[in-house]
């Protein structure tokens, strides 16, 4: 118990710099920190305003303005248009397994969700009080963030090894800095940030509460869009293979928010493996709508009597890094595919990408 309390206090301290004011007079907020990291001006009177005169931040802001502007034009605006036409009745919850910190595409595909549940192996990490970084520390931190995000800004997915190197042991580490950036660049306002832990029954615990053994750690971010409606983003660091998924409380927690809609992309074809059958079965049982590329759940696992399939794009098979994952029934299904004007997944070029919209007709 004493050992856990020390861990819990340390976990809570990680978020102090961003979830609540650092100095009562300064009013440093998570939202201002997110905007600063995203290359966007913080609110008037923020202690971070002084740092925006730093040439490294100004270069960073120009870089992100250009990168996100291109991404918006090339993909995100087109995904939102596709969603508006093809998703008739979205659920309040969306599940995004193997996501990394990719809130950007979760929001683009499911802008009307009110609860977003993201999960991956990477830890949440921390965001320190940026005003207290040593001289030159801000520029180095911003550069590492840019490097860690280069693949998703260019290709729509994270390269996990690169992200670990760039956001491993530095001032900014884990997924939280990137979640902040994506929230800010998606036009969201962060209202609250807290560490969260799940016990093995799926119950959520905060602050110094003891979740017991087999805990699953994460972060809960409460935010609002331009309409002011409050929403919640959960990110959990968890192993989704059977040996872990069956003893942790993560899927039990997800079940309390089900049914939901699900997104699967660039998932290393893990859901093709028998070692990930637990999460695969959860998604099939608790998803009203599934959007996936071919790295998601193989067609053979869908009950053809319960699901209706709407293929988009072109199925060109897996990339060379994933041999043996070709699906002949995908080839047959995609003979009737509708066109789409954006790229997604490992085959990120628009004329090579595939997307399968599956609707549970139960």
Where are these regions (language model features)?
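Thiol-based oxidoreductase modules, predominantly thioredoxin-like and allied folds used
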Residues: 117-164, 191-210
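Non-globular targeting/processing and membrane-anchoring segments
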Residues: 25-149, 231-362
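Short, thiol/selenol-centered motifs that function as redox-active sites or metal-ligating centers
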Residues: 99-110, 155-180
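Sec/Tat signal peptide C-region and signal peptidase I cleavage site
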Residues: 20-24
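Bacterial N-terminal signal peptides that target proteins for export
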Residues: 1-9
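Short, surface-exposed basic-aromatic patches at helix termini and helix-loop junctions that form
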Residues: 88, 176-188, 209-212, 225
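Short aromatic loop motif centered on NTY/YTY
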Residues: 167, 192-235
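Bacterial N-terminal signal peptides
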Residues: 9-18
């Amino acid at each position: 118990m004493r050992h856990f309390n020390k861990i819990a206090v340390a976990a809570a301290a990680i978020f102090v710099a961003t979830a609540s004011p650092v100095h009562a007079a300064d009013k440093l907020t998570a939202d201002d920190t997110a905007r600063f990291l995203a290359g966007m001006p913080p609110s008037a009177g923020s202690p971070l305003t002084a740092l925006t005169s730093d040439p490294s931040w100004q270069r960073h802001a120009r870089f992100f303005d250009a990168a996100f502007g291109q991404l918006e034009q090339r993909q995100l605006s087109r995904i939102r248009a596709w969603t508006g036409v093809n998703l008739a009745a979205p659920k309040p919850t969306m599940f995004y397994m193997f996501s990394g910190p990719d809130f950007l595409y979760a929001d683009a595909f499911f802008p009307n969700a009110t609860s977003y549940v993201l999960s991956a192996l990477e830890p949440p990490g921390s965001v320190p009080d940026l005003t207290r970084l040593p001289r030159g520390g801000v520029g180095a931190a911003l550069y590492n963030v840019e490097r860690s995000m280069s693949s998703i800004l260019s290709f729509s997915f994270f390269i996990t090894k690169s992200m670990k190197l760039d956001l491993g042991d530095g001032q900014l580490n884990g997924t939280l800095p990137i979640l902040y950036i994506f929230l800010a660049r998606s036009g969201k306002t962060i209202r609250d940030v807290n560490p969260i832990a799940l016990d093995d029954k799926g119950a959520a615990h905060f602050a110094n509460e003891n979740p017991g053994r087999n805990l699953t750690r994460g972060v809960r971010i409460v935010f609002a869009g331009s309409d002011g409606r409050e929403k919640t983003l959960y990110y959990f660091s968890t192993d989704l293979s059977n040996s872990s998924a069956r003893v942790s409380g993560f899927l039990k927690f997800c079940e309390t928010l089900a049914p939901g809609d699900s997104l699967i992309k660039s998932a290393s074809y893990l859901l093709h493996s028998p070692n990930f059958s637990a999460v695969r079965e959860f998604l099939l049982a608790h998803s009203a709508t599934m959007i996936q590329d071919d790295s998601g759940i193989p067609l053979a696992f869908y009950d053809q009597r319960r699901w209706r399939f709407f293929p988009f794009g072109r199925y060109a098979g897996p990339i060379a890094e994933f041999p043996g994952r070709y699906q002949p029934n995908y080839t047959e299904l995609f003979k009737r595919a509708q066109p789409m004007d954006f790229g997604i997944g490992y085959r990120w070029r628009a004329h090579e990408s595939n997307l399968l919209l599956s609707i549970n007709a139960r």
